[in-house]
């Protein structure tokens, strides 16, 4: 059985599907990733320093200047979900219980209509005042070079997990992954902890859960998966959907 037919069969057999997505999920929407030759790490110096909790506290004015520049494309909005995002919504329409565990901060899974999305690294869509808790949307953030709380004038903080910060919903993600019949990892290099521990956790806690990786390139964790498909997400899921519909 070829890989596409195998994955289609496993999806049909699964009732509960957990999907771990990374930056490669959104590149087909025109959003750059972090680690490719054209990604953020190649375009900017010291990314992990300037996007850290430490630097936000040290120099919040320069932090925002750099943050807005690094994420200018995302901050402008206008990006649309791609075939990969829509495929996950389609799985829900098939009657599957789908939980998306995303490392992305672009909000495209929700835009595509997925109903159960755990944004592990937060979202670009909002920022919060660390002093009084007031929350502000993207239009407010973009109107101000350095966004300050209207109530107390504190410089607000983006609702993304900065380097050195805690990932607040990890326990929920581990539980959802272990409770699934099928774990799909899509468009992720599996380089970032603690998210990259999810396949290990599933293997230990739920050995019957099938684990599948779809990615353009090999990762250091390929050996953790029952099935690895190398290729673009859009093309791969189109083939899988066609196979499911044909059977």
Curated annotation (Swiss-Prot):
Family the UniProt entry places it in: Belongs to the sirtuin family. Class U subfamily.
Subcellular localization, as worded in the UniProt entry: Cytoplasm
Keyword Metal-binding: yes
The EC number(s) this enzyme carries: 2.3.1.286
Pfam families hit by this protein: SIR2
Physiological role: NAD-dependent protein deacetylase which modulates the activities of several enzymes which are inactive in their acetylated form.
Name listed for the protein in its UniProt record: NAD-dependent protein deacetylase 2
Stretches assigned to the Deacetylase sirtuin-type domain: 1-247
Gene Ontology CC annotation, any one: cytoplasm
Cofactor(s) for this UniProt protein: Zn(2+)
Keyword Ribonucleoprotein: no
Chain positions recorded as Zn(2+) binding sites: 129, 132, 149, 152
Free-text comment on the cofactor: Binds 1 zinc ion per subunit.
Enzyme class, broadest EC rank: transferase
